[in-house]
């Protein structure tokens, strides 16, 4: 942390004062804080009015004739004794003070390591001494102070030394209604600080350039010579009750790694199996909901998806959902036709249904492998694993085991006895005990590491899932784990991420909206409109798809990435987040969880009950997606009568406007014998010595063409402007 920021935060600490009350004096010869002999607390020595000490006592006050807090006999308290000096100071009273040393009118503080506030003695109606106190104002820092990207009003007050009430008033004047615990961003804080004459700079934590935000970028940056083959990472998806969990159990029970045999099985969200000495990592989070929830947070952990379809039930609604999610993720798919032992099993019917859903298996001439299995009988499990290894060989999954480890959190929880517990899938490098790690917005040091068999490990190589202990807080699923050389730097980055998360929480929207598409397209961000379509009945889906297909152009495509009937679910919203899609509900509404998720992440959900209204809205959005089209409008012609060369070597063309007019805003073409020599802009346009904006037909003028000097008498110049043409779908 910079010295500027430390001084900014420290100024608030220096502003806290502890009020001291003037007590009695002490006995003769003792420093202040006690009383004179025989006097009650708070009184004086013989002949002294209240607030002093016994005769001859050093400290807060003195006896008659001595300089001190009280006067001699007959004098009212607070002045001097006969011939005395200034009002007395206090002795040490044991109360907390600051390092500062303050000299007050009523006395002189001692350097006791505490702050002294201004105190004087007043008289109560009963004649007793009463202390009155003035608290010193907060000390404002000199020079610029460093402020984080977000902070509370209280933190801002402490950093700047400006009272919280003053800050709240300034915020109110600026149109911001806040309380002392309200978060404000740096821009707002800087404006308010400037109002109080305080200069600020935004604090940036060190070494942010080394922070991993995307594991794919890490892998792409590795030297190909350092990359080694790694096990594939597999997720199993499918319709409920089609046997996803049973298939996982069957795989695990038949092919658990031999080195782990006899261990105590731990549920850690992922595990490894072996076939022919090669490992395969399975994520034990079946279902596309978990898969897409992690994708929505930017996590890319799955290499291959196994789609489980029951041979007796065939393709079901959640099967179609899973297919949509896999296609959106762009990962290879293997179809596992399960329950082939069922009496009414029909694998060929399943393959035909998959073809109708756009998944063409190899038996039908496609490129999607399929295998028939029975999780119940543990039949053909090895066949499925062999196909997984074959797909892995084709895709050549690799990582660098010698790099500092990076990985993704699969799941995490707070354990009562062990503290934060997280399962991490190492994706590059090797994770080791005692590594300092940055995980999302938390940090820690790897104290313990074990696998799904409960075996303690000293290190974990790429594609290995392990449980780690030693984090300071519970991370979120999908957070990136990164080994850091310096734990202090990791903590600083984690703090910055926490502040950034608070700032993002203040934002109203992060998702794609139909209203925002026009500007997004103009900025070149989107050329494809992704839609998730949910309707009341299947017939409505077909009609809407047909209507939307009529709107496609060569430049803009509507892509329905998922379609289904019934309620809009949280899974739909997660897919929309991951795919930057809009959800359209045709006589379909979201459930409460989906509504909350959509509001949190700014996903646009549109509701319709008339197809025409739906297509009109989409058409308006697509118009903004079309490339702008321009046409030329010729405004005038001129003949080159003469040319002059300037000292700057630029050529001035002496023109006679033969038709229309010339304007500085127009483009110009230089033609010779009907051939275009140059097409560009006007650098200068003058009549005599004066700059002019335009010249009408029948007048002469001088003109310089920007960046072009090959002009001779007899050339013709054409002047035109470009006019935007509104596009239609």
Curated annotation (Swiss-Prot):
<dbReference type="Pfam" id="PF04760">
    <property type="entry name" value="IF2_N"/>
</dbReference>
<feature type="region of interest" description="G3">
    <location>
        <begin position="284"/>
        <end position="287"/>
    </location>
</feature>
<feature type="compositionally biased region" description="Low complexity">
    <location>
        <begin position="112"/>
        <end position="127"/>
    </location>
</feature>
<feature type="binding site">
    <location>
        <begin position="238"/>
        <end position="245"/>
    </location>
    <ligand>
        <name>GTP</name>
    </ligand>
</feature>
<dbReference type="InterPro" id="IPR006847">
    <property type="entry name" value="IF2_N"/>
</dbReference>
<keyword id="KW-0963">Cytoplasm</keyword>
<feature type="binding site">
    <location>
        <begin position="284"/>
        <end position="288"/>
    </location>
    <ligand>
        <name>GTP</name>
    </ligand>
</feature>
<dbReference type="Pfam" id="PF00009">
    <property type="entry name" value="GTP_EFTU"/>
</dbReference>
<dbReference type="InterPro" id="IPR005225">
    <property type="entry name" value="Small_GTP-bd"/>
</dbReference>
<dbReference type="Pfam" id="PF11987">
    <property type="entry name" value="IF-2"/>
</dbReference>
<dbReference type="InterPro" id="IPR015760">
    <property type="entry name" value="TIF_IF2"/>
</dbReference>
<feature type="region of interest" description="G4">
    <location>
        <begin position="338"/>
        <end position="341"/>
    </location>
</feature>
<dbReference type="GO" id="GO:0005525">
    <property type="term" value="F:GTP binding"/>
</dbReference>
<dbReference type="InterPro" id="IPR000178">
    <property type="entry name" value="TF_IF2_bacterial-like"/>
</dbReference>
<feature type="region of interest" description="G1">
    <location>
        <begin position="238"/>
        <end position="245"/>
    </location>
</feature>
<keyword id="KW-0342">GTP-binding</keyword>
<feature type="region of interest" description="G5">
    <location>
        <begin position="374"/>
        <end position="376"/>
    </location>
</feature>
<dbReference type="InterPro" id="IPR009000">
    <property type="entry name" value="Transl_B-barrel_sf"/>
</dbReference>
<feature type="region of interest" description="G2">
    <location>
        <begin position="263"/>
        <end position="267"/>
    </location>
</feature>
<dbReference type="GO" id="GO:0003924">
    <property type="term" value="F:GTPase activity"/>
</dbReference>
<dbReference type="InterPro" id="IPR053905">
    <property type="entry name" value="EF-G-like_DII"/>
</dbReference>
<dbReference type="Pfam" id="PF03144">
    <property type="entry name" value="GTP_EFTU_D2"/>
</dbReference>
<dbReference type="InterPro" id="IPR000795">
    <property type="entry name" value="T_Tr_GTP-bd_dom"/>
</dbReference>
<keyword id="KW-0648">Protein biosynthesis</keyword>
<dbReference type="Pfam" id="PF22042">
    <property type="entry name" value="EF-G_D2"/>
</dbReference>
<dbReference type="InterPro" id="IPR036925">
    <property type="entry name" value="TIF_IF2_dom3_sf"/>
</dbReference>
<feature type="binding site">
    <location>
        <begin position="338"/>
        <end position="341"/>
    </location>
    <ligand>
        <name>GTP</name>
    </ligand>
</feature>
<dbReference type="GO" id="GO:0003743">
    <property type="term" value="F:translation initiation factor activity"/>
</dbReference>
<comment type="function">
    <text>One of the essential components for the initiation of protein synthesis. Protects formylmethionyl-tRNA from spontaneous hydrolysis and promotes its binding to the 30S ribosomal subunits. Also involved in the hydrolysis of GTP during the formation of the 70S ribosomal complex.</text>
</comment>
<dbReference type="InterPro" id="IPR023115">
    <property type="entry name" value="TIF_IF2_dom3"/>
</dbReference>
<comment type="similarity">
    <text>Belongs to the TRAFAC class translation factor GTPase superfamily. Classic translation factor GTPase family. IF-2 subfamily.</text>
</comment>
<dbReference type="InterPro" id="IPR004161">
    <property type="entry name" value="EFTu-like_2"/>
</dbReference>
<keyword id="KW-0396">Initiation factor</keyword>
<feature type="region of interest" description="Disordered">
    <location>
        <begin position="20"/>
        <end position="141"/>
    </location>
</feature>
<feature type="compositionally biased region" description="Gly residues">
    <location>
        <begin position="22"/>
        <end position="91"/>
    </location>
</feature>
<dbReference type="GO" id="GO:0005829">
    <property type="term" value="C:cytosol"/>
</dbReference>
<feature type="domain" description="tr-type G">
    <location>
        <begin position="229"/>
        <end position="396"/>
    </location>
</feature>
<feature type="compositionally biased region" description="Basic and acidic residues">
    <location>
        <begin position="92"/>
        <end position="108"/>
    </location>
</feature>
<keyword id="KW-0547">Nucleotide-binding</keyword>
<protein>
    <recommendedName>
        <fullName>Translation initiation factor IF-2</fullName>
    </recommendedName>
</protein>
<dbReference type="InterPro" id="IPR027417">
    <property type="entry name" value="P-loop_NTPase"/>
</dbReference>
<dbReference type="InterPro" id="IPR044145">
    <property type="entry name" value="IF2_II"/>
</dbReference>
